[in-house]
Amino acid sequence: MVKRKHLLGLQELSKEEINTILDIARPMRDIIMRDIKKVPTLRGKTVATLFYEPSTRTRSSFELAAKFLSADTLSINVSSSSVQKGESLIDTIRTLEAMGVEIIAVRHQQSGVPKFISLNTKMSVINAGDGFHEHPTQALLDLFTIKQKLYKIEGLKVAIIGDIYHSRVARSNIWGLLKLGAEVTVCGPPSLIPVEIEKLGVRVEINLQRTLEWADVVNVLRIQKERQDAGYLTTLDEYRDWYGLTQEKLEKLKGKKLLILHPGPLNRGVEIDDYVADSPNAVVNEQVTNGVAVRMAVLYLLAGGNESGNVD
């Protein structure tokens, strides 16, 4: 990772590179827990966020990560920028480059846009989510959270539940989990499971209760209403009955402990109920905190930081 200029996806990272990011995220999290959440590591650097899709968590997380490292930040509001006047993506990138931006986090509705930008700029590019392709920093924060809570990833049984077909979060998690030695099962309606996904090395299960009995960790994906409108689901109520993580389904496990993750935002009453979302086993808010730490680690490494993680 130290030698990489960009973070475009977990598919291209080695196990060692992933572990380097997770290791450096630990001291970054310590910084976040302090009263004074600031170190001078990236003073003089400029980090921009360019999001062509709505985002609260990811965008704010990148901006806070940069500020905690003392970088200057620039947030491009696409809805009120020159993009609305017809400015091309390349011209937008060249403008930011000319302004002195060194690192840019990009989210786009089309897969491959961060890669395209990386081939046409001197800036370091971070993929903040591209189409159905990847969302690497979300997967990294999920991995970090699992390791923080269970002290390991190798040998764990991790289930990803929900709309696998449209989920960049699922894809990045699959790459990362498999590289770190976890077993992975995907579970959801057959209409939302990609054909031949088993070729990646994952198991496919359509019965949620069997999946919960198998798993040590479950990552519950958000279900979007537009999937129902497009015919992938009959009703959200039916989805909740079959695949929603509920108190009733957990009680059938007879006290078995499950670590429960969710990338947010939660659709309470659809993919997860209030009882589960607010239970001690759910670590959604810790994921948010860890997301800032992981993104600090990524910014630090892309800016040329060493693997010791010594930032003070």
Curated annotation (Swiss-Prot):
Query: Which ranges form a coiled coil?
Result: none
A GO cellular component annotated for this chain's UniProt record is: cytosol
Q: Which UniProt keywords are listed?
A: Pyrimidine biosynthesis, Transferase
Q: Which InterPro entries match?
A: Asp/Orn_carbamoyltranf_P-bd, Asp/Orn_carbamoylTrfase, Asp/Orn_carbamoylTrfase_sf, Asp_carbamoyltransf, Asp_carbamoyltransf_Asp/Orn-bd
Binding residues for carbamoyl phosphate = R57, T58, R107, H135, Q138, G264, P265
Pathway given in the UniProt record: Pyrimidine metabolism; UMP biosynthesis via de novo pathway; (S)-dihydroorotate from bicarbonate: step 2/3
Record-level GO BP terms = 'de novo' pyrimidine nucleobase biosynthetic process; 'de novo' UMP biosynthetic process; amino acid metabolic process
Q: Which top EC class is named for this enzyme in its record?
A: transferase
Which SUPFAM superfamilies does UniProt cross-reference here? Aspartate/ornithine carbamoyltransferase (SSF53671)
**Catalytic activity, reaction form:** carbamoyl phosphate + L-aspartate = N-carbamoyl-L-aspartate + phosphate + H(+)
Q: Which family does it belong to?
A: Belongs to the aspartate/ornithine carbamoyltransferase superfamily. ATCase family.
On subunit structure and binding partners, the annotation says: Heterododecamer (2C3:3R2) of six catalytic PyrB chains organized as two trimers (C3), and six regulatory PyrI chains organized as three dimers (R2).
* PANTHER family assigned: ASPARTATE CARBAMOYLTRANSFERASE, ORNITHINE CARBAMOYLTRANSFERASE, MITOCHONDRIAL
Which HAMAP family is this protein grouped with?
Asp_carb_tr
* Name of the featured protein: Aspartate carbamoyltransferase catalytic subunit
The organism of origin for this protein? Carboxydothermus hydrogenoformans (strain ATCC BAA-161 / DSM 6008 / Z-2901)
Gene encoding the protein: pyrB
